[in-house]
Amino acid sequence: MSKQRVVVGMSGGVDSSVTAWLLKEQGYDVVGLFMKNWEDDDDSEYCSTRQDWIDVVSVADLIGIDVEAVNFAAEYKDRVFAEFLREYSAGRTPNPDVLCNAEIKFKAFLDHAMSLGAETIATGHYARVREIDGRFELLKARDHTKDQSYFLHRLNQAQLSKTLFPLGDIPKTKVREIAEQIGLPNAKKKDSTGICFIGERPFRDFLNRYLPTRPGPMKTTDGKTVGEHIGLAFYTFGQRKGIGLGGSKDGSGEPWFVAGKDIESNTLYVAQGHDHPWLLSRTLTAGNTSWVAGHAPEVGHACAAKTRYRQADAACTFGAAGANADPNALFSLHFADAQWAVTPGQSAVLYDGDVCLGGGIIEHAATAQPVTRQPQKAALLTAR
């Protein structure tokens, strides 16, 4: 009887390498696939694509699997990076990893894997998939400190039905131990923390290569001008570093934070103190939705949500975003406690315990001064 073929997305990192080894040990016919999705290889200081490929080949040789490379650079720039720039141009702060997973790792990659005769794909993400009566659920990883379901919430039933997450039940510390025990050449390689497929590099410098700077006034929440910003795209809600203000503008000594943007007047608003009212929200509206089950929760459903990665789950109530709004497409969340720096462009992801329900892109968060939190319109990719 032939073995079930699984194509593993291999990045050259420890997680995907251990994933491939575990599946080989479980008897699968494992093929490794290395995705190249960014062409800027000349920027060797920050882009380690060549070294990553070398690591993938070394790991494949050690564990005894075939491996190949595939170039999705065109798909990445069209489906992910173009949207990334559009959102920043509109003053929002997108999360490229969310879109990258939905459009590249679990769409372009999945399609290519199927063309290689795979029955399933696997990645080194920390999450779990559970099947109940032919329906699939996306669950948090057992190790909640490493859970990545937030980035995977846009996966649908078809994608989850063909996906394995072998690390979902394993603590990260154990994954490192396995890598060292079996002698993986990349066992001590640090985890990647840069933009999906682009790598680790000074973010402001990178963004400046693609978006023009448009300086404008920097004002306090009471309208006093305290400086000049270099362009709204280069700041995000809740940002503290890189504003260029000390802690003494009002004598309190508290740090300054980005608290709002007015796109029409090109004004950046700053507030002093972590818990300033402009930084706190109890209600948000989100659109561009994706639901794991194929439909939204019932209006009035009590659940939990994250408005940024690594945030603790926050109790909330799911609602429609208006009297005539379809909550499958546009929804609101009402939080029991005020949430800090809820940021347009980021994902609001809903949970029932460990079960990820899906979510949407934050459009608006109600604060003490809603004028700067009006929905910031951007041309969104319909494919997302």
Curated annotation (Swiss-Prot):
Site feature Interaction with tRNA, where: H125, Q346
Chain spans, region Interaction with tRNA: 146-148, 308-309
Keywords of the record: ATP-binding, Cytoplasm, Disulfide bond, Nucleotide-binding, RNA-binding, Transferase, tRNA processing, tRNA-binding
Primary enzyme class: transferase
Active site: C100 (nucleophile), C196 (cysteine persulfide intermediate)
Catalyses which reaction(s): S-sulfanyl-L-cysteinyl-[protein] + uridine(34) in tRNA + AH2 + ATP = 2-thiouridine(34) in tRNA + L-cysteinyl-[protein] + A + AMP + diphosphate + H(+)
Region of interest called Interaction with target base in tRNA, as start-end residue ranges on this chain: 95-97
Binding site for ATP: G9, M10, S11, G12, G13, V14, D15, S16, M35, G124
Keyword Lipoprotein among UniProt keywords: no
GO MF annotation: an example: tRNA-uridine 2-sulfurtransferase activity
One Pfam family from the record: tRNA_Me_trans_M
EC id: 2.8.1.13
InterPro entries: MnmA-like, MnmA-like_C, MnmA-like_central, MnmA-like_central_sf, Rossmann-like_a/b/a_fold
GO terms for biological process, alphabetical: tRNA wobble position uridine thiolation
Keyword RNA-binding: yes
Main location: cytoplasm
Record localization: Cytoplasm
A single GO cellular-component term on record: cytoplasm
Disulfide bonds: C100-C196
Domain of life per record: Bacteria
Family: Belongs to the MnmA/TRMU family.
Function: Catalyzes the 2-thiolation of uridine at the wobble position (U34) of tRNA, leading to the formation of s(2)U34.
Annotated protein name in UniProt: tRNA-specific 2-thiouridylase MnmA
Organism whose genome encodes this protein: Paraburkholderia phymatum (strain DSM 17167 / CIP 108236 / LMG 21445 / STM815)
Gene that this sequence comes from: mnmA
